[in-house]
Amino acid sequence: MGGLSLPHLIVLALVVLILFGRGRISEMMGDFGKGIKSFKQGMNDEDSKPVTPPPAQIPPASLQQTPPPAQPAPQPTSTDQAQ
């Protein structure tokens, strides 16, 4: 149930043949074949290109930052202790 049997496929093929005609179907199949051929050529061209990693970028010395030296905690003054 729900599947296409042989008689259904034959009727479907006849309807498609009537709608598009024999010439149009063969033209579409030729275009389909050309598309597959160009796709395969494109895939082969992509595979034949050597893959080179991009050169590593070394940051300039002026952009490298060193952490600031640690500053000692401020010493409490005599006015801070009086309160």
Swiss-Prot record:
Organism expressing this protein natively: Novosphingobium aromaticivorans (strain ATCC 700278 / DSM 12444 / CCUG 56034 / CIP 105152 / NBRC 16084 / F199)
Biological processes annotated in GO: protein transport by the Tat complex
Listed name of the protein: Sec-independent protein translocase protein TatA
Ranges in coiled-coil conformation: none
GO MF term list: protein transmembrane transporter activity
Family: Belongs to the TatA/E family.
Cellular localization per UniProt: Cell inner membrane
Function text: Part of the twin-arginine translocation (Tat) system that transports large folded proteins containing a characteristic twin-arginine motif in their signal peptide across membranes. TatA could form the protein-conducting channel of the Tat system.
Keywords: Cell inner membrane, Cell membrane, Membrane, Protein transport, Translocation, Transmembrane, Transmembrane helix, Transport
Parts of the chain that traverse the membrane: 1-21
Quaternary organization: The Tat system comprises two distinct complexes: a TatABC complex, containing multiple copies of TatA, TatB and TatC subunits, and a separate TatA complex, containing only TatA subunits. Substrates initially bind to the TatABC complex, which probably triggers association of the separate TatA complex to form the active translocon.
